[in-house]
Every structure is written in C-alpha cells, then in structure tokens.
Curated annotation (Swiss-Prot):
Belongs to the universal ribosomal protein uL22 family. The keyword Ribonucleoprotein applies. It holds the Pfam family Ribosomal_L22. GO terms for biological process: cytoplasmic translation. This protein binds specifically to 23S rRNA. It makes multiple contacts with different domains of the 23S rRNA in the assembled 50S subunit and ribosome. The globular domain of the protein is located near the polypeptide exit tunnel on the outside of the subunit, while an extended beta-hairpin is found that lines the wall of the exit tunnel in the center of the 70S ribosome. The gene is rpl22. This is Large ribosomal subunit protein uL22. PROSITE patterns: RIBOSOMAL_L22. Gene3D superfamilies: Ribosomal protein L22/L17.
C-alpha cells in the first residue's frame, strides 16, 4: 500500500472567481510535463486546449527550453529551435484541463473567458518494479509519476 501525503495548491486564490483541478501520480515524463506546463501557463483555456490537440496530432511542437540537449530543431519561426511532440504527456494534461473546465462550469463561471492562472508539476511517487534476469539477477524498472495542478481564472 502506498501512503500519500496531503498535496496543497501552490498559490491561494479567491474561490469564487477561480476553478481548479489536480491530477496525482500520472505516469508521464516529468521533463515533458514541465515543458508543456511552461508553454501553456498564462494562455486562454481554449487556446491551450487547441495547442494540446495540435501537439497530440503532431502539427505543433512543444518548445523544450530547459531539457533541450540532443533535441532536434523544428521548422517554422517559433522563437526557439528545440522542440518535440510529447503526445502521452499532452493527453494527460489535456484531460486535467477538461476537468478544470468542468469544475468552472459547475461553479457558474463563464467558460469562454477563462485563462490558466497557474499550472505546475511536482514529482510524484516512483513505482519500483524489477525484471528477473538470468543467474539470479534482477534489473530495476522504475516508473516515474507526476502531480499536476491547474488553476483557472475568469478574466474580463
């Protein structure tokens, strides 16, 4: 059994004007999650959803600014040469954004005028597995997980 501590949101906001959602222990790459969150932070919600759908369809790359060693360049004037298409991470973050949008709709906020006020990633648990090999040895097969938190705000 895995014991999890309480994970709080990084910033405190007015609950009447914001909606939030959190995904815990999502089995995606921390580096990919960080780069996607950095790309969509501050965007309008509809733009961010369209951006992630384009990443999933491999029409638009995510710019890799920190984790960019040995990352190929992408064509087009993007403002940064290195980029990739992290499809698995984009699907997971898109799902969390849709949950946050549903929470905003439930609260009565105007879903057409929402922007991402805060989105961040935290390191989750590491799922440790071992693959048996010959002569009594074992190879570790660790899976990293990520916590993602999103706060949406209504703008005017």
């Amino acid at each position: 059994m895995i014991m999890m501590g309480k994970l709080k949101y990084k910033i405190q906001v007015n609950p009447e004007k914001t909606a939030r959602a959190m995904g815990r222990n999502i089995p995606i790459s921390r580096k990919h999650a960080r780069e996607i969150c950095k790309s969509i932070n501050g965007m309008k919600l509809d733009e961010a959803i369209k951006f992630l759908e384009d990443v999933i369809a491999m029409r638009r790359p995510v710019l890799f600014r920190r984790h960019c060693k040995k990352v190929g360049h992408r064509k087009g004037k993007l403002g940064w040469p290195a980029g990739r298409y992290p499809v698995k991470a984009a699907k997971a973050i898109l799902k969390i954004l849709q949950h946050a949008k549903a929470n905003a709709e439930y609260k009565g906020l105007n879903t057409e005028k929402l922007r991402i006020k805060h989105i961040s990633t935290n390191k989750g648990i590491t799922i440790k597995r071992y693959m048996p090999r010959a002569f009594g040895r074992a190879t570790p097969k660790f899976q990293e997980t990520v916590h993602i938190q999103v706060i949406l705000e209504e703008y005017h």
